[in-house]
A protein has these predicted regions:
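N-terminal lobe of the biotin/lipoate ligase/transferase fold
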Residues: 1-90, 110, 117, 159, ...
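Long, positively charged amphipathic alpha-helical accessory segments at protein N-termini or as interdomain linkers
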Residues: 1-3, 67-69, 75-94, 104-250
């Protein structure tokens, strides 16, 4: 089946667009993009809170009912957001940080949270959630518990949220289509934008253990392949922390 048309469902306020999409999965059409002006309980990966003040950023979740490799859904979501940012601010220096964040230098601009929807027969769909910092002011960015940036902080100007949400919908249609038609091509493009390849980074395991490692490769299933003290190891979960010593500008 071809990728569906992306249709936006606009909400004024919601606890979390991902939660709304999951709770209403059965009645929402494939390709519905749930958008909210604000979230009262925005969520990121590993239970992190996503700062979600009203009218400043993109908060949205895409309903994906056509299933391929679930990991590739994350790749499609990351590439759509990256394409939005690169088209809007070509000199922003944006790249993908494994597994799915979008960074500019050592500062996070967007987080993506993909969650499976399951029933008695198995996985019935995926909800891909997006938080993209657009017009967040520096004083708000300073309150976040990790270095962060917005399009406004990077460029010094404000952006039309409605226009950018429409552009995001276009990019999602493009990459949802690629996800369905050619997952291998999708993965190759996603991997090419992971600028941590070949660099030393700090890998943080789910239990909090931090390791300084050399990134050697990313496997086709999304596992990060790193070298530590001459030994290759593979990780399918955890996070990569970028410090001031980690520079990935183009």
């Amino acid at each position: 089946m071809p990728a569906p048309k992306i249709n936006c469902l606009n909400l004024e306020s919601v606890d979390s667009t991902n939660t709304y999409a999951k709770n209403n999965f059965d009645v929402l059409a494939d390709g519905t993009l749930v958008c909210a002006e604000m979230q009262t309980a925005g969520r990121g990966r590993q239970g992190r809170r996503w700062v979600s003040p009203p009218g400043t950023n993109i908060y949205a979740s895409l309903v994906m009912k056509q299933i391929r490799n679930p990991f590739y859904a994350t790749a499609a979501a990351s590439l759509a957001v990256l394409a939005l940012l690169l088209e809007t601010l070509p000199r922003g220096g944006f790249f993908i940080k494994w597994p799915n964040d979008i960074y500019a230098g050592a500062k996070k601009v967007s987080g993506i949270l993909c969650e499976a929807v399951s029933d008695s027969r198995g996985i019935s769909g995926i909800i891909a959630g997006f938080g993209v910092n657009i017009n967040l002011e520096q004083q708000e960015l300073d309150k976040i518990d990790q270095p962060a940036a917005s399009l406004k902080s990077l460029s010094g100007k404000s952006f039309d949220l409605g226009k950018l949400t429409g552009l995001l919908a276009d990019k999602l249609a493009e990459y949802y289509g690629l996800y369905l038609a050619s997952p291998e091509k999708l993965f190759a493009e996603w991997k090419s934008h992971n600028r941590i390849l070949g660099h030393q980074v700090t890998l943080i395991e789910p239990d909090g253990t931090a390791r300084r490692v050399q990134v050697r490769d990313i496997a086709g299933n999304g596992e990060l392949i790193v070298e530590e003290n001459g030994t290759l190891r593979r990780f399918n979960c955890g996070d990569v922390s970028l410090g001031k010593e980690d520079r990935f500008e183009s």
